[in-house]
């Protein structure tokens, strides 16, 4: 199988983008893993697929696959790359497009300064809808938020649980660079209280409108930036009374700006940040390569 692809990144969160709008693209999880493999494939945190929508009133369908081959609900950094890709590829000349994601629709707008503004939707804090199992736990209130105790390697971490269309667990730490993200991240990601696993966010408060953030992403590990993770962290910080919008989010890959008016019911978060094309190419992806990679990773 020969595939044309575009390699892109949003604040260092990198993607293989495929045009499934003008050609059929049907990949197995093993083939997704092969494309995302940094040694034998193109290499990426996620694979993004552009398709024709299956619902009325939208321009495109936006699908996201993690580097482990699993399909996920949302990716904010990928959304910015998505709108740049469809414009650069000539699939649309609109500055603003409405796209179908796994849970609903979002609006993406290319701004005059080259950054992309993404309507990320309204954050959800109901544990059942994240989902997060609270049975037997006693939460504690902080501002308008509820923090939940989570046993992580024998230590209790107090977390906010948020859905941005995908699940997030956010905790505040004193020094995000010194914190053992690579130790605690995978434990939180697969914690039994998150039945669909979770993205683990570690937020350091720099000021009332500025944070540093690291995210250990579900199915991808720590990435240089996570758009939904930035939104979840800012939403949790505002609800806890720690932050005021707009908030500048520093990630290892770059800066994002998140705006949210928590006082208004059902108000969406808005995320602004960069999107860049790295290169375009074509790759031969025989079934044997995908199978060999799948076997080597399972060994």
UniProtKB/Swiss-Prot annotation:
Function noted in UniProt: Catalyzes the stereoinversion of LL-2,6-diaminopimelate (L,L-DAP) to meso-diaminopimelate (meso-DAP), a precursor of L-lysine and an essential component of the bacterial peptidoglycan.
Binding site for substrate: 13, 46, 66, 76-77, 166, 199, 217-218, 227-228
Main location: cytoplasm
Organism: Paraburkholderia phytofirmans (strain DSM 17436 / LMG 22146 / PsJN)
Family: Belongs to the diaminopimelate epimerase family.
Pfam families, A to Z: DAP_epimerase
Enzyme Commission number(s): 5.1.1.7
Active-site residues, Swiss-Prot/TrEMBL: 75 (proton donor), 226 (proton acceptor)
Keywords annotated in UniProt: Amino-acid biosynthesis, Cytoplasm, Isomerase, Lysine biosynthesis
Identification of the protein by name: Diaminopimelate epimerase
Domain of life of the source: Bacteria
Pathway in which this enzyme or protein is active: Amino-acid biosynthesis; L-lysine biosynthesis via DAP pathway; DL-2,6-diaminopimelate from LL-2,6-diaminopimelate: step 1/1
GO MF term set: diaminopimelate epimerase activity
Subcellular location: Cytoplasm
Annotated positions for site Could be important to modulate the pK values of the two catalytic cysteine residues: 168, 217
Enzyme class: isomerase
Residue ranges of the TM segments: none
Subunit structure: Homodimer.
Keyword Isomerase listed: yes
Catalysed transformations (reactions): (2S,6S)-2,6-diaminopimelate = meso-2,6-diaminopimelate
GO annotation, biological process: lysine biosynthetic process via diaminopimelate
Cellular component, GO annotation: cytosol
